[in-house]
């Protein structure tokens, strides 16, 4: 008689699958958390690579105010002590310091990519700081408990918010005009708001200080945009005493980070032209007027910085997306107070921008600038749309979460259990992907280096040689740069407009014309040296004696007809009699005065 082997675990144990063959729940959850945590940053990196395109090649991306130079020196200009408003403080000093560790063009690429990574991941992290709208409670794609963490928010919703914040007309126009320092503060804005809204009422000083670092590096305008949100967020939580404590903490940090540019601004008188109010006023770049363009995050004062293809039929669809995002913020995000203070900052920024676009607002702002030059920070009002961009990104994110959840519930309800599973997955997934891709599809002009406008360029070898000659001279005296204009269009930079690079290239004091021509308007120079030299440069006849009296040691001609007409011969001798031509080629002529 055969004896049957008895399994001590019972007959059912043989029917159960072996646990080591099953996927491990802990590993699965860890992988899901990793995907949810790092996806926004990776998507931001992908957006940065797509936006920069040819600009990622070796060399420098040089466009309007985006002036990076090889091995930038520390000079008086770096610290805002050369005259004029210290707009590039401390951003130039940070770049100069980082360029001691790696090539300056690599520093530039890392900063530009960091802007997209911080912006996308920050907006994604902000979408669900706490709570969820009641309207989303029945969504099967949302957590059932009353509090929710960022990791519980649908990934599609977080990515939609991140993509919208990192890829929009505001980012495109500010990137083309070269205001990377402002965009650095823009990228850090959601992290500042998150540090003020997350956790208890008491501010964690270290976390807030770390979140403010991008704005601190960006300087005055980056900090001004950040303050527009940080101050109302500080007083939006706690009782009266706690609100006062929070406000004092935020003001203290903002003040401390403002010292690098505030000190030179107080030490050296700042001169501003009130005509800049009209020159820098917002302009319509869509069929919906200046106010509509601003609501859609466009409206830059410089018409040359509008992305190619923007403003046509795609702008109509983009307006619909913006209105849906604003509705999502007002109806879904704001009731849960997940981004306290953001609505106030967004509204204040929009009011500042619209005021500059209207005649009464421009008149009032002109009077303010005449009364105190510090109000000149409000001339370019479109830059204060940064909080509105964040509000629209958050609104789009929660709207996508609501739509995806509602679609999943509707599809699942239309099919019996066990059927329609594919549709229940594909339809919400398609809606989520569409929400993520909408900003990119509607603004293709930002892709591939803004349609080729942002590309890499190399400074000519003669420029490096001229720098060695001029900085190696121990005799005192400034360098005068001609032609007498603020912007250049160098052939070696593809004829793209670029702000004069020589002040950042030389350690010696450089005098150039920083007056700005906008259409038929001229905004007067802000550097007192430029105002002093303007009558001399514009006069006819020999300039040698007057330039020497003005303290000029070198004259640099780097563009225009002066290169061909005054390099040598009788014309050059009559213009600067006795001057030595140290270097002359098709890109540059350098004169040294005796």
Where in the sequence are the language-model features?
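Extracytoplasmic
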Residues: 37, 41-45, 436-594
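Membrane-interface helix-loop-helix junctions at transmembrane boundaries of multi-pass membrane enzymes
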Residues: 239-245, 324-364, 410, 418-427
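Membrane-embedded helix bundles of polyisoprenyl
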Residues: 44, 120-126, 150, 154-238, ...
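Membrane-helix boundary/interfacial segments in multi-pass membrane proteins
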Residues: 171-183, 347-395, 402-411, 416
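Periplasmic/ER-lumenal interhelical loops and adjacent helix-loop junctions
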Residues: 78-79, 250-330, 381-382
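Membrane-interface coil-to-helix junctions
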Residues: 44-121, 163, 167-175, 180-184
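Signature aromatic-anchored transmembrane alpha helix within multi-pass, membrane-resident enzymes
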Residues: 252-255, 397-444
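Transmembrane-helix motifs of polytopic, lipid-linked glycan transferases
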Residues: 110-145
